[in-house]
Amino acid sequence: MSLAEVRHDWQKAQIEALFALPMNDLLFKAHSIHRETFDPNEVQISRLLSIKTGACPEDCKYCPQSARYDTGLEKERLLEIDKVLTEAKSAKAAGASRFCMGAAWRNPRDKDMPYLTQMVKDVRALGMETCMTLGMLSSEQAGKLADAGLDYYNHNLDTSPEYYGDVITTRTYQSRLDTLTNVRASGMKVCSGGIVGMGEKATDRAGLLQQLANLEQHPDSVPINMLVKVAGTPFENIDDLDPLEFVRTIAVARILMPKSRVRLSAGRESMSDELQSMCFFAGANSIFYGCKLLTTPNPEENDDMSLFRRLGLHPEQGPQANIENDSALLAKASAKQDKSTKQFFDAAAL
C-alpha cells in the first residue's frame, strides 16, 4: 500500500498529531513518503529576482518592502526586460531550472500586463520554467499570464486564518484564496506556502498546512520560509523559532502534500548545514539559489554547491538542461521583443 496518499480532507487534530510525533518517527514517515514520490537526492533549483522593489502599500509586518515601515530600502522601478534576461541567463548557467520574478505590488495594473507577458515570453525562450509573484490577480490577469506561457504563479497564504490578522490587515485571507483559484483556473501551476517564526503558535503552523493541503488541488510547489527579521519592521524583535520546529513543519508538509515540491525558502542564510540537511531528509526538495531573495540575504551559490556535494545531492535538470545554445536563445528572445519595449517600460513605471 502506498504511503503517499493524496488527501484533501485533513482535520487540524490529525495534523497536530503529526507535529507531536517523536522526531525520529516523524522524520521516518516523511522521508519514506518523500522517497516513494521523488528522487530523494534531487533538488530543484530556482532563482528569484526582484523586478520591482519597495513602495508596496500593504502592511505585512514581516516585509521590508512595505512603504509603511522605515527599513532603509530604496524603491526601484520595474526592471527593463533586457536586464531581466541577463539575470535569467546567468541563473540558468549557474544551474537554475526555474526563474522567478517578484514585484512589490498589491496587484498588477492592467497597463502593466503587456510588459509582464512579454517578459514571460522572453524568459521562456531561454528554455527555463517561469514563475511570477505580483500580488493579487484577477481571473483576466491570470488568463493573460497563462496565455503568455507563465508556468507557475506564487501567492503565499503566509499563516493560519486565525493568526493572519496579527500579520497583515490590508488584504484578506479570502482574497489570497481567490487569487489561487484564479491561477489554477487559468491552467497555471500554483506555488503557495507560508512563513513560520512570526510569533505564531504550533496550532497556527498546523492550520497553515491544513489550508494548503485541503485545497481542491495541492499546490505544485510549497515554499516554507523561516522569518528573516529586518530592522524597521514590526517583527524585527520577535522571538526566534526553535529550528527543530521548522524541520517539523517541512516534514508535515511532505506528509500532507506528498507529490508537491516542498521548497526550503527564505531564512537559509542563518541555518546551519546540519539544519538544512535535516530539512532535505524531511522532504524539502527545492531551494532558491543565489545570494539574495528579493531583498533578503541567501547563501552564496558556492556554499550551496559545496553542501550538495557533501550530501550527495544533485540539481534537477530543467526542461532544456543543455546550455550550449544559450547565446542563440538569448538572441532569439531579444529579437522577439516588441520594438516598443521602452513604451512598455514607461507604461509600467511607478
Curated annotation (Swiss-Prot):
SMART domains: BATS (SM00876), Elp3 (SM00729). Its EC number is 2.8.1.6. Pfam families: BATS, Radical_SAM. [2Fe-2S] cluster binds at C100, C131, C191, R263. PROSITE patterns: RADICAL_SAM (PS51918). Binds 1 [4Fe-4S] cluster. The cluster is coordinated with 3 cysteines and an exchangeable S-adenosyl-L-methionine. Keywords: 2Fe-2S, 4Fe-4S, Biotin biosynthesis, Iron, Iron-sulfur, Metal-binding, S-adenosyl-L-methionine, Transferase. GO terms for biological process: biotin biosynthetic process. Pathway: Cofactor biosynthesis; biotin biosynthesis; biotin from 7,8-diaminononanoate: step 2/2. Residues 41-268 form the Radical SAM core domain. Signal peptide: none annotated. The keyword Transferase applies. Its cofactor is [4Fe-4S] cluster; [2Fe-2S] cluster. Belongs to the radical SAM superfamily. Biotin synthase family. NCBIfam families: bioB. Catalyzes the conversion of dethiobiotin (DTB) to biotin by the insertion of a sulfur atom into dethiobiotin via a radical-based mechanism. This is Biotin synthase. It comes from Shewanella frigidimarina (strain NCIMB 400). The lineage of its organism: Bacteria, Pseudomonadati, Pseudomonadota, Gammaproteobacteria, Alteromonadales. The gene is bioB.
